[in-house]
């Protein structure tokens, strides 16, 4: 895993640099160049604490399961992981890599198999067969970012509880109307 280039705000805090989809193709090479990183949008989110953070725009549906998870266009913020050995099974990571078989930036749920073959197993939350599990060789992984938060434009769909409450409310309104009609003054 390589050292990352960061930018800082006026008070000396690390900015969160955003890598939008349009910039992801050049990120693998550009990430080591200060000018490239400074050309990307940067922002700050209160409450993240200390550390180096980077944001990436999500593309595709591989991490979308049952209408929950990560939607295309979501922004995921990850904290820099200095040692690849620190990848923990079952957590979501953003992996910057130079493997030929997959995108250079992938958002996946990972399994650490470094001691059993020198690979990180990358799993999609979407169970559709078009999003298969795949291994990433350790030598192909250039940056690791542990998922911390997401910014999304999607509002969660109502749960079954809301549907039941809405049905009860509708029934009450209908009963109220029927009761009004049955009273002698109406």
Write out the residue ranges for each language-model feature.
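Short, intrinsically disordered/low-complexity patches at protein termini
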Residues: 101, 144-146, 157
